């Protein structure tokens, strides 16, 4: 059982004007829900209304905010990353740069920009420690996205030194949870597996085909824990240094598949398609710094998080053929 650690401070958030870019997305929805429960005045920035690649749109988005939480991003799984490297690099880099500059010009008091574990070098020793972040190039399929997100740390440090602008860019582990993207074209591993296993169980399919060998390892952070970490970062993180946010627990992809199979109740065969890429060989985080600087520790076990996610996704299929 994971320990219960720090919770966001309602007195900090009460009536505070907070802008959340990507606030209608997967992680943003959880962040906005927590902020509203804490009494913040929340402005949700949607891509349909604000193209943050445009400096003018970014300026309008952050105007009047005391705190900005930047979550808007172009994201996808391994297949999407391999097909669309250019927009993953360009869109994420330009959106982040515009949000930093326009937040500074608008007099925002604190900017929290989500960074990603994909920023780490391909062959970083596990667990990933923040001091190893700059010791190599990311895994190739992740590099355009990972390096664009890594620039959030560069911008945070540069703006702090040049303008004394208070910002941080916590490095988030792989996220999962209800309301994730379950589209097989661009979903991440847990959402893709859940969709495949639930569909196979529902339709009586004898096997589920999964990408790769199943041998790589990953770390998975439940979305509600990630949302809490970002609010704690806004309150407590007074540095532009990288800070890992995760569970600090490693899970083999093959074991993840077995867990999801069991929870779904699928009794067929799992087939591993080794002609498909595995991605990075191993990935999980040393989370000591987050515990020390933010008082953060994840509280949702992988089994419980998977159960909630599966139940949520399955409920969307009720009545469908």
Where are these regions (language model features)?
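Adenosine-cofactor binding site in Rossmann-like domains, unifying the SAM/SAH pocket
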Residues: 36, 42-58
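Conserved Rossmann-fold NAD(P)-dependent oxidoreductase catalytic core, especially the SDR/UDP-sugar
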Residues: 97-142
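Conserved beta-loop-beta element that borders a ligand/cofactor-binding pocket
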Residues: 115-116, 153-178, 191-194, 202-209
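Flexible, glycine-rich beta-alpha linker
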Residues: 51, 119-121, 168-190, 216-217
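Active-site helix of classical SDR
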Residues: 144, 148-151
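NAD(P)H cofactor-binding loop motif with strongest signal on the N-terminal glycine-rich segment
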Residues: 23
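C-terminal substrate-binding subdomain of Rossmann-fold SDR/epimerase-dehydratase oxidoreductases
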Residues: 11, 26, 32-40, 199-321
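NAD(P)H-binding glycine-rich loop region in Rossmannoid oxidoreductase-like domains
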Residues: 52-93, 102-105
